[in-house]
Amino acid sequence: MRPGFSVPGESGRERPAFPLPCACGTLRPMPPPAKKPAQKKKPLPLLPDFRFEIEEGAPARLVCGVDEAGRGPLAGPVVAAAVIIDLTRCPEGLNDSKKLDAARRADLLAELADCAEIGVGIASVEEIDEINILHATMLAMTRAVASLPRAPHIALIDGNRCPPSLACASRAVIGGDALARSIAAASIVAKVTRDRMMAALAETHPGYGFEKHMGYSTPEHFDALSRLGPCAIHRRSFAPVRKMLSPGLEEGLDLVSGESVNLLIQKAY
């Protein structure tokens, strides 16, 4: 081994120094294995705040949050709520209604009734079947905003589209019920209101379990449909219900009217 290309090794042996020339190039020591970057811990989920409301000028301008409950069920109306919150008197723990249990939603609704302006809008089963669930939802939202004690300057709408016939400006907020407090409040109002309406409808349409599943597609609901057939508050335009209707029964259904819905709203509260 040529001088200058070896270093003392263990037991007096010599080992080659690096780099060494070879037929395929220069040999270099293997770099140490790269350390994996430490994985960042996922931040804890945050509660909705007033960021969107403040961006739209609150509290100087009236900003309402709007959300709905009941787009997916096979039975019952779709309910929307619009809420204007006093930024200085906001109940603690406001969140997307789906993340709260029924008792907590009821408590928050009671608090909101004392410190917020609330409007509720309904689209009946008949309207859902006539204009489809999407347009019925937009109609319910429009009615909710129109029923507020004061007309807002702008409405923050949960989702990716806004009702076209609102009397004020609007802004769609995807996932808004988990981001904006006024939308979270609206989701709670809409959910509790509709649940109470479905419990009242369960009394006049027994056997379906509406007070438990609120008209959603559950095994219990499908079992009742197969035994009893659709009733007056089932949505004929929804495929699972439509498949169970005979032509004669479809013509004879006595659907829930807007006037009946207003009575149910009063009973819900």
Curated annotation (Swiss-Prot):
User: Where is this gene product found?
Assistant: Cytoplasm
State whether keyword Chloroplast applies: no
What keywords tag this UniProt record?
Cytoplasm, Endonuclease, Hydrolase, Manganese, Metal-binding, Nuclease
A single GO cellular-component term from the record reads:
ribonuclease H2 complex
Q: Which GO terms describe its molecular function?
A: manganese ion binding; RNA binding; RNA-DNA hybrid ribonuclease activity
Q: Quote the record's binding site residues for a divalent metal cation.
A: D67, E68, D158
* Stored CDD domains: RNase_HII_bacteria_HII_like
State the source organism's domain of life: Bacteria
Cofactor(s) this protein cannot do without:
Mn(2+); Mg(2+)
Q: Which NCBIfam families match?
A: PRK00015.1-3
State the function annotated in the UniProt record: Endonuclease that specifically degrades the RNA of RNA-DNA hybrids.
Name of the protein in its database record: Ribonuclease HII
